[in-house]
């Protein structure tokens, strides 16, 4: 998206085409010092420019912890989230094994000072990474791992 950035794993058009209203993705989220939770993302509706998602958080046993919130995102903005600088990022072809399944994918690893952010994108699932980690000074401070996907 920028001349000093790597190509993104998916184009805005691929993200739009991969957005299926009614799809529900659940991800286990862990933050340093907090209990793990499940983040739920539901694809609600789409048009040529963007899509509407609904989000909420659940406990590991499925109890809703907050009211759902809807958000509209523009396809190009979603693509831009994966735009990473060449001088700080490596890209590797990998096999991704998560509770949701095993996928061929791309692993983007961005290093900025003591912070290492790693994003695993399943090439068959245009959109958000199915796994993410953030480490600061070697300590894991955040992770998100897709655990289930339900399509209509």
Report residues per predicted region:
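Acidic, serine/threonine-rich low-complexity disordered tracts
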Residues: 1-152
């Amino acid at each position: 998206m920028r001349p000093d950035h790597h190509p993104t794993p998916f184009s805005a058009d691929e993200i739009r085409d991969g957005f299926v209203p009614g799809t529900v993705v659940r991800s286990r989220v862990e933050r340093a010092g907090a209990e793990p939770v499940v983040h739920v993302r539901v694809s609600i509706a789409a048009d040529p420019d963007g899509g509407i998602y609904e989000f909420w958080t659940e406990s590991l046993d499925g109890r809703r912890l907050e009211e759902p919130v809807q958000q509209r995102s523009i396809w190009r903005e979603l693509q831009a989230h994966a735009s990473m600088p060449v001088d700080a990022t490596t890209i590797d072809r990998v096999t991704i094994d998560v509770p949701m399944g095993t996928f061929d994918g791309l692993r983007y690893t961005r290093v900025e000072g003591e912070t290492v952010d790693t994003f695993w994108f399943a090439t068959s699932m245009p959109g958000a990474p199915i796994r993410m980690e953030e480490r600061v000074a070697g300590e894991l401070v955040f992770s998100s791992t897709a655990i289930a996907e339900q399509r209509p």
